[in-house]
Amino acid sequence: MRYGICTGIENAGLVKKLGYDYIELSVTKTMGLDPAAYAAGKKALEESGIEAECFNILFPKTMNFVDGKTTSLDALEIYLEKAMAMIADLNGKVVVFGSGKCRTCPPEVKYLDAYENLVKACRLTGEIAGRYGIRVVIEPLSR
């Protein structure tokens, strides 16, 4: 059995020291770092010898790709290219497609329309992740 922990990239050294096998980083938080903080975090990750194998929180709460109006497929594609490039840059292998708020069907949207939009978003996510050699795992959320 292997153990990982969800935390920020700046904690890579501590995670290794505590005996964890890997670190799980937030996509949105890591993408939100300024260039200097990102570089420092990447250096800390490399120096610690711990791997950032898995990433969570793929999408920011401001996105919604099931309602058909908040986030276009074009905007989603641009975002995913940046996200997957960052994950690959940190040698990530897996990203969790959770992000419940982004895939919540608003009451005014027909369920079938929301479902079709979600399928499009999942396919696009998988296609882009595949180009970077990243596996997408879907978190089974029920709300």
Predicted segment positions?
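Active-site acidic/histidine proton-transfer and metal-coordination neighborhood
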Residues: 66-143
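Acidic-and-aromatic substrate-binding clefts and catalytic sites of carbohydrate-active enzymes
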Residues: 6-13, 26-40, 63-65, 103-106, ...
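Histidine-centered beta-alpha loop that forms part of the nucleotide-sugar donor binding/catalytic region
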Residues: 8, 57, 100
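Acidic (Asp/Glu)-rich catalytic clusters
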Residues: 12-19, 35-56, 82-92, 126-132
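Extreme N-terminal starter segment of soluble prokaryotic enzymes
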Residues: 1-3
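Conserved beta-strand positions in the central sheet of alpha/beta enzyme cores
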Residues: 22-24, 54-56, 96, 137
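Aromatic-lined carbohydrate-binding surfaces of glycoside hydrolases
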Residues: 57-63
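Short, glycine/charged-enriched secondary-structure capping and boundary segments
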Residues: 18-20, 37-40, 68-69, 109-112
